[in-house]
Design a protein with these regions (language model features):
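Short amphipathic alpha-helices and their capping/turn segments at secondary-structure boundaries
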Residues: 34-52
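Active-site-proximal C-terminal subdomain of hydrolase catalytic domains
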Residues: 98-181
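Short, solvent-exposed polar/charged micro-motifs at secondary-structure junctions
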Residues: 16-17, 38-43, 64-66, 134-138
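Solvent-exposed, well-ordered amphipathic alpha-helical segments
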Residues: 15-29, 46-55, 97-99
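A domain-level signal for caspase-like cysteine endopeptidase catalytic cores
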Residues: 1-40
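Catalytic cores of nucleophile-dependent amide-cleaving enzymes
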Residues: 53-57, 62-135
């Protein structure tokens, strides 16, 4: 039973950040909601493959993260989305884990603990802004299973000063493309 990585990117509406992330990620799975993500992950594992890493990329903050159009925090994970998320149990291989790729989601320790309790594998996220055009994850990592641990270094402090002019240029070009069509 091969171990696979699954990279889910919110695609419920057009968003420049998600679009760039999807463009730079080969084989990403576009997701519209928690239910959509679960169904697509189950389909990817239907042949017997098991998950090494399930990475979910969506906008986030210190309280939670979007899974497509669904806002997932500790409360919604434990109540509203629990029946759907529980369907991921058993799809992970040995050492499998879940990564949330939204900005500052590593601060949401309660959410990470809730995901561990529901899905049954460690859940991790990073404690800084995340940028799809830079490889790797930014900031310290919080990984929660039966307990939470923080490791790693601080995020690049210079990233915003480098990215802000690039973002502005990118948005102008993108707006120009939109205006043409």
């Amino acid at each position: 039973m091969p171990l696979i990585d699954i990279y889910c990117v919110a695609d419920h509406e057009f968003d420049e950040t998600m679009w760039v992330d999807g463009l730079l990620t080969q084989g990403e799975v576009g997701i519209a909601s928690v239910a959509d993500m679960v169904a697509k992950v189950q389909a990817r594992c239907a042949g017997g493959d098991r998950i090494r890493e399930l990475r979910v990329f969506g906008h986030g903050d210190e309280w939670g993260q979007y899974f497509g159009a669904d806002w997932v925090n500790e409360q919604t994970a434990m109540h509203r989305f629990r029946p759907q998320l529980e369907q991921l149990r058993g799809l992970f291989g040995p050492g499998g884990f879940m990564t949330l790729g939204g900005c500052d989601v590593g601060e949401a320790a309660a959410l990470l603990r809730a995901l561990f309790a529901i899905v049954g594998v460690p859940a991790q996220a990073f404690m800084a802004k995340q940028y799809p055009v830079f490889p790797g994850d930014e900031g310290r990592r919080r990984r929660c299973s039966d307990r939470c641990e923080v490791s790693g270094s601080q995020a690049w402090e210079h990233v915003d000063t480098v990215l802000d002019p690039l973002r502005e240029r990118f948005h102008r070009k993108l707006q120009g493309l939109r205006d043409r069509f």
